[in-house]
Amino acid sequence: MYVTVVTLLTVLRRSVRVNRHRLSGLDSAFLHLERGPAHMHVGGTMIFEGPAPEYEEFQQAISERLHLVPRFRQKVRFVPLGQGRPKWVDDPHFNLDYHVRHTALPPPGSEEQLRTLAARIFSQRLDRSKPLWELWLADGLERNRFGLVTKTHHALIDGVSGIDLATVLFDTEREPAPVPEGEHWVPHPEPSGVQVLGEALVERATSPAEIARGVKSLVRAPRQAAGAIVDALDAAGTLARAGLAAPASPFNVDIGPYRRFAVVRADLDELKRIKNEVGGTVNDVVLAVVAGAVGRYLRGRGYSTQDLELRAMVPISVRTADERGALGNRVSSFMAPLPVWCDDPIERLRTVSATMGDLKESKQAVGASLLTEFTDFAPPTITGQAARLQSRQRFFNLVVTNVPGPQSPLYLMGRELQAVFPMVPLAKRQAVCFGIMSYNGQVNFGLVGDYDAMPHLEELGRDVEWAISELSDAAPKAKRPRRKRAASAKQAAKA
């Protein structure tokens, strides 16, 4: 049955018309996952040069650009009786004052104080009766700087589309570019509960007809359908094998609603040098650094890491070029082993690189993407139950998300963005996660931890710094493996 469903989705996923105001199955799942102490918003803490703009001036700059992201004036409307996925509707009471906020750091205005502020902001759940985002302007940062803290619900945006959205708020030159004028915004009347329910029931009734039209297309293109079916079967088997429970760890404990936030700065050129000297990719280097830091942290807290291999969920974007700039989530993921047992930094990186290479060939991400698309066809009650079941099962120990950002300076109202640190949500019984983002030659780590379960989060941040230094020092002495000879030997063995 499982294989049949995945196969059907593979060949029909482009056949059914999508209501652009209806949340996708994955976006809906993020709302279902937001229960108890688990908040499902993403964010970032940014540091800018120069004095902060006046609040009214800053708010005006945001107001002038809102027509470019109309979703930011919409709220989630749930379907009565759970008869459909939620939809986006205009908020007739939209008030920019509520979403764009202003605060000041107390003297001396240290970066530590900014991180504390960001953690407190991140600890509060977004109000679902309003558009799901907040933007905090924090002035008074030392050395003539100011901060910006963003908070947006995961149902609205993913990491890659967030970078596209930044182009709406930021300029690529110090001199602000002219903003195209938008029409005066008049919200559509909010639909009644009966209207929302009726629309959802009509969509559910017409969906079988849409699928039937997709089935007819299989008859017209049997070869393409056969290829898709083979890929789906392969991906389904790989994903099933990856779904085994992750090992127990001190990071998988009950959490509360409050958060801590720590950051680490790294140099992109240094990480590139490491991967050039040892092999692999920059993402492999990042995962090896996380594995080394986590292993050192656990040993420092008295835990044995002998033979311990944790599992990280590594989100990847499946957003196409045509979808860049669109809001909503287009992500899949790998379940990547973290060799925290390994004391040798070079062996650790090569182990990560080899396993990630195997995962990419295994089509695990394809299987996860297909199951994600299953939620677009499944009844909403099943989607909600599946999301809650996933939150109860320990499929991974922590999240490590690495988002490539722009490699040239960005500006906000003429002020240069100096650094950005991502903030990733904690799922149920997930006490820590790693968000990594590259920007303008930097690679910055944002560590989010549960306030009670991770009282030593800053220590884990120092372990990340140590793991980078350890790997950087060892890399020049490493002998890069000869891939061509290995590939030739592999081909000879097949002959």
Regions found by a protein language model. Give the residues of each.
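Soluble acyl-CoA-dependent acyltransferase catalytic core bearing the H(X)4D motif
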Residues: Y2-L26, E34-H39, G43-Q430, F434-E465, ...
